[in-house]
């Protein structure tokens, strides 16, 4: 009984048969023996070294994975004849022979399987030809002739599965044919033709082999030409070698073996006295099986007809020039002729064009090719290579083409002694030829000197890589390697131009680096050894802190006192550099303050009457930090000399008279005198009085305190202020102090006594009245506070000043103490009657947001109204008023939440902003996690989110555009996160929540409060310093939130762990659904050094280009083991 096995095993079987086409392996079936008990199969390996202990043994077995029969009556057994031959015996009945047999030989990657298909001699249908080898794209025709006719349909199967059915009347000349058009390699396999309802033992079994390329082609892509295999050889589609039929050998199967011999080198002998008669030879694919050379027929026992030769007698001799046909070898040519048909005349071989001089690098193992032509064609063994020392090398590979034979020689490792003349020799029966060529062995270059340091900065080294070298040129490349001193990390390397200096960038400040050079010359193995190493040290780090000018005071026409400040962070610097630029004259004055703790300096020797631009910057070693915002200072013109002979006289307890003389030789007419008054020993600021009548040289100073000592000095003004006079000291009268003048003394005493009495009475009454008024005012304020909030709010502005807010008809007046003048800030006014409150959108501890319909400029629109609760704290009022100030100053932008207007009603402030119908971005992202909300939808559509990759990237791009606008307006957000981004119409994202924003370049937080730690930059965590660059860090976290669909940053880590690990270089890992380019942008935002983070303009540009690329930068497909990023609401509150 025969039945088909599982077709699932076929790929393993047939793929294995394609491995190692050049393996010398033959499977023989002795068809002369018809008795199953005497039948045997033999597998022979002709591989050199076959049977070594390390190689797997030859295997020969019946392969019932394809065609199965009942197990034989007794087990089959193997008989081994040495290590290279094995025989299978033990068959008991004819059905044991039907099916597929396989022989496996070779080792490692060359392990090869050879197949043989045996048909029953008594079958109903018998194949005209068992093995068919065709090319990819050809038409294959399988033909079975009728051996025992049945009037039933014929079923065709492929690898055991139904393939086609033919009506029994479709037989043509007693044959059933299956035509397969445009066959492909998967079409290979075992085919069978069987009468319907007949025993499978009566089937005709075929084997179809489809080469992986078209006719005459081989290799990957089938772009290489086959060598033109002769005498029925088949070109292997993997390596292009010819698989020769039994009885032939050679690169192109051009040589015939002696009668009765087979194998790749004709080394095997057919058994018995009958020679190869009755034997079927099966070879590695793509050859298949055939009779031996000179035999044909189903049992390979029929000799070839006259004029035919070769395996299965498929070849015709067609001999020319007196040649005779031999059924085993083909045409036997007379002397002077050769070729398949004796069509080629013998001639002396000739070596073709060859380079006269070649160059190799020492230690390499080159391949040298030598091509020759002639009749007969040069073959392997007829071409040799002679070295200068007389050593002869044999070719390792021969490529035969229609007009030439090319031999390839593998040369052992070259030494300098191999330099000299080499010779290629060829010898055939037609003669011999040779050709000499010169080989130059070169030594790769090695630097003799270490690279030189030309310049250095904190993060850069400028290096001259090459001075001199040993060995041979020319220099094709210079590879510079560098790494930190005493470090074990891998060397960093760059390839540079040997004629140019090299700048090593992105180094660590104040760090030693070992720098060395490797040179290369052209050709394989041209890399030389390392040259001497040089130690180079980078400069000190640049100061990162930016000072700001607090004040400057002109103390004279050529003297200027300057004060500045720094953020309260650890100072790394050696001092300060003050720069004054005189633009009119194109001159610069620099003042070096070498004391890093200094915060003030007196600049002298300046040019009077000059406009200066002033800035200050921190320096460290020789490097300058960022300059402060510049200030413009005007020095007055040079003034007159000091007034002369100033003296003072007390007139009473509140009056002192000053007298002086005009300055000598003033520079022009005096316009006025200036008197300076200051309490002696006091800490208060001095006061000044102008004497507008320049002809007067005295003045009575009134309103002074009794019994108080004062200091006075005077200076004149022409076009500029002059020098101060000498300082005089005088005290007012009182408590026994009398005037020096005898006449005015009594008068002054009486007047002083009267005035003291009057002042005492008036002071007592005034104090009583003020006390009563204060009590009444306090009662009124308390009562009004209970009824409603007052209309004045105080908050701390970004500049540190206390600010009072007052509302008056659309003007927000910011009165900043101690400045006496208010600073009005206008905002669009909404009337209370034009606001219709609707639903509560959100609520916090001290504030709430209500959706409302407002009427503005005659149009109704949706708005979000923000307001404080009744018991909000002073800090909440401060932040709320500050947010209105920010919104007013920012203006309009499509990617920020814009101000619609504000309204004051009964002491409450109401701010109307744009309404975002989709809420905040964080909730919007989390709601899109469709695998959690609707798993059936997610699996049906294969997506993890209702949002596309492009929409997520659009959120990030919009947010970057909004932050670019904020940074250009010099506003620091300080709380950028997905919860503070709103989703508006058309799913546009808008930056919101400006309660913590600051309109400054640098802000140092001095107050306590809850901090968004997981979104904060390192410098903000450690030093409470906020800049636009710290907003860039927060944007990187926001980008991570978008990609992770609202995951909690650093989920599973505490704030304390973040404080510890972020400075050590820890960063969030790349989300699995995130493209490398997007994650690289996050990493750029999270760089340690703020100045290395990209500006928002660059971020917005990069995200815009990603949108234009239309690439899926965020993968929302449900890939294997997909999980969402974790969410920890408790951690987000910290």
From Swiss-Prot:
It is an enzyme of class 2 (transferase). It is found in: Cell membrane. CDD domains: EGF_CA, EGF_Lam, FN3, PTKc_Tie1. One of its GO terms (biological process) is vasculogenesis. Residues 212-254, 256-301, 303-343 form the EGF-like domain. InterPro entries: EGF-like_dom, FN3_dom, FN3_sf, Ig-like_dom, Ig-like_dom_sf, Ig-like_fold, Ig_sub, Immunoglobulin_dom. Transmembrane tyrosine-protein kinase that may modulate TEK/TIE2 activity and contribute to the regulation of angiogenesis. This is Tyrosine-protein kinase receptor Tie-1.
